[in-house]
Amino acid sequence: MGARDCTPLLMLSFLLFPLGFPVLGAPARLICDSRVLERYILEAREAENATMGCAEGCSFNENITVPDTKVNFYAWKRMEVQQQAQEVWQGLALLSEAILRGQALLANASQPCEALRLHVDKAVSGLRSLTSLLRALGAQKEAISLPDATPSAAPLRAFTVDALSKLFRIYSNFLRGKLTLYTGEACRRGDR
């Protein structure tokens, strides 16, 4: 009864054991699945659309610095991978700071709208997840490996916004632009 009962269980465990191996490399490949990035882009667009017509409660009492999301495709394609990684990593860091600052300003507002707070909280969560996924893809290491003395490593271009709708537009544009370009190239390289 004892040995016979263990045999099917042992066989089942041998069958299921290899299924655990793909999970070890899942985070790096996860960002390479276009549906994952599309989900974050969709959330950013929803937040942008929700705040477009918003006047009351959507303006900040101070300016928030955000990354410039414009992409010169010719220059981008000629950039070294490390430069692209640095631009994306710095942009993501600045955008995270901006969203967190927006969250703090919204929390201190006299009558914060719960729907706006929900969109900001989702953006904070999304940026944390994207940061983790980019770290698994190696973006942080590539950005750090770029020598500071490289003349083509220009400082990140930035400007300020004064409203939640503008902040979400930048968030959406950054995800659709530089982040999508970088992850697409990093995933195509196939060494991840």
UniProtKB/Swiss-Prot annotation:
GO terms for biological process: cell surface receptor signaling pathway via STAT; cellular hyperosmotic response; embryo implantation; erythrocyte differentiation; erythrocyte maturation; erythropoietin-mediated signaling pathway; hemoglobin biosynthetic process; myeloid cell apoptotic process. The gene is EPO. GO terms for molecular function: cytokine activity; erythropoietin receptor binding; hormone activity; protein kinase activator activity. PROSITE patterns: EPO_TPO (PS00817). Residues 1-25 form the signal peptide. Belongs to the EPO/TPO family. Disulfide bonds join 32-187, 54-58. This is Erythropoietin. Glycans are attached at residues 49, 63, 108. Gene3D superfamilies: 1.20.1250.10. Produced by kidney or liver of adult mammals and by liver of fetal or neonatal mammals.
